[in-house]
Amino acid sequence: IPEIAKERIRRAGRKIKEESQLTTQDLDTGFRVFRIDSGNYKNVTMQPNEYDQQMLDLFVDNIKADRTDLDLLFGAMLAWGVQLSLPMTTEEVDGCKIYAVDGNGLVACFAENISENVVQTMAAKQPLRVLFRDSCFDEDKTKINIFERFKQQLDWDEKEAIQNIRVV
């Protein structure tokens, strides 16, 4: 049934484009398809007697290996109550992909060891919310510095920054 529905939507989009009087405009008839899946995170909740010192490296990254940037982005959007139908753009800076949802509603980057230029580009968008993956930062002090930069540049107090900046 989902495949039939997707094909009908594609055909309807083509028909609308063919019959549209707006031939000079790029008419967007695209759509997103979602499926229900398990969460993006590994279960790392264990009792102290269930693991040993050699296993600690297994818990460095709590995100499941098969998850994509978009999985993380849409998961965060759901958690924040942000509509999944909002427009989204991507921009590449220093080899890192930056996602912007609804203009400046949510700005995210999941690349490893992001550069100062990436952070500056994200902050310049004056986002309402910011999302990073923990592996974006090579050290905790880098994470703290970026947190403080967003607070300063966006004129957020501590509480606003904690609410609006997430690291997954």
PLM regions: where:
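Accessory, often C-terminal, charged low-complexity segments
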Residues: 1-168
